Amino acid sequence: NRHFDEDNLLNWVATNILMDNMDTDANNFFIYSPLNNNKWLILPWDYDDGWDSGRSQDFIRPYQAGISTYWGNRLLNRYFRIQENVDKLTAKLEDLHEKYINEQTVTTQLDKYASFVEQYVQKYPDNQYLPIIGINYQSEIQSIISTPIRALERYYEDLEKPKPFFQHNKAVLEDGQHIFAWDVSFDLQGDDLYYDVTIARDPAMQQVIYQQVDLRLNEVRVSQLEQGTYYMKVTVKDSVGNTQTSFDMIKDSDTGEY
């Protein structure tokens, strides 16, 4: 509360979650301090990947739901490590969903202009660039209407999962061994965490050179490898079986994203 307005912060996170606006973890917002206020406020900006539309994009990762979406944000990472703050967000989400962002309120807003807009998305130039022409239009409308409740369900599911983490980009050579490492995950319930790691010569992880499961440490050591490019995939699971991926991805121009 010294530097940020907590209610503003919670409203911003909760609104983005309910509207499924995932591309807000480290961008697409302004930080603003008005002249008559000594605290910083977060102003929303850019919702073009919200309302379920972003989930069809290839840059959206499996971890992007609920609090995990913001785990790479240092401020929110520190804030949500405290259970009291998680409880505040849950209360804020439930309040906003009950009063403002739900199936009924979204339907009311869509009813004001959905039929008017439909005639234009069928015509040039929109019909050349929008993926919601023809029979898809009504299904898109229904997807928007159901976004808040599905987002809230994903939020509850994400609370049980370990949080995503970063893998280290370089393998350190030490005493004739290459060390492959990653950051430690975090579990909101304090469950024990176990890592599964695979190292391969290809991004599809088909040419495997090392594999181990149920590791408690956040590194593995393998005998010195030949010079070249190697790929590592690490996942984490808690003691009751909830799993999570790392933040990392790689885009291969020939075979796609991993």
Residue ranges and their predicted role:
Residues N1-D25, Y32-D187, D192:
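Middle-to-C-terminal accessory/interaction subdomains
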